[in-house]
Amino acid sequence: QVKTDTLAFQAYSQRMQVFMQQLENDPFTAFQDSVNMALYQAHPIKKRLTVADVQQLDYAKALQIYQQRFANAADFSFAVVGNVDLDAIEPLLEQYVATLPAQQDREKLTHPILTISGKKTVHFTTDMVQPKTTVYICNYKTGAVSSKQTLVYKLLDAVLDMVYTESVREEQGGTYGVSTNISVNQLPIPAVYMAIHFQTDSTKVATLLPIIYDELGKIATKGPKAEHLQKAKEYAKKTYIDQQINNGYWLDRLVDTQFYGYDIQASYLSDLEKITAKDIQKAAKTLLNSPNLKEVVQVGVSNK
């Protein structure tokens, strides 16, 4: 039985409307909207909520959707990790999990949210009290990615962090830091994504943008510096060892085996040692040559 609380819902709605109104007045909101449009066009699920959207929320419909999602638990997967007594938890699972309704039907994802293919470049200006420029670069490549390749992309991510710290932050003094994130997704389709984000002074973006691409191009052409790769491996090994005591780490490994069919844990350290500069070079080339580049640049201009 779903517990209802109309007053709590109304209070939540009011808080959300105030928050959404504040977002409307934030210059960064225009940047986020532009990134979403570049990546997903006008996909309704990726559309930013507005005050009008919150005002139209239907509490009864929300409860109905909630009940529908738990009406058939046949294809649910449950994972329990941590310091638990298996004998003590078994009756709880029998009481709260095993009693969930289940039928023979299985659901399939029919409307996946996919990043649009092709190149997209969006540059625009926004009035600001304190002008700054924000840059977001994304590229992705579809295709199956093995557990070892996942580790290769993890090392490339770390190498790029070091490269951009040296070239963009220290040599150019153009930003506090460049954020890079390379992630491997298995669902809804296998793909690897690279996202690069930084903020800088509006007068420096023309200098810094080419450096971002040039540094990735150098790795794709010549491979990473030996010291960068070594540091990336050392950090990956240390992180791997440190994470062994974290529940979240083991939960991720269960997800890997349950949904993706591979066990990165079994060969992590041996795979790590086998990765060469050529592997990193190939990964960089894959991302650099992918035709799905998205570049969004918001240039702040003074409204004084």
Predicted regions and their residues:
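M16 family metallopeptidases and their MPP-like homologs
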Residues: 1, 10-21, 27-54, 73-81, ...
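Mature hydrolase/peptidase catalytic cores and their serpin-fold inhibitory cores, especially
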Residues: 178, 278-285
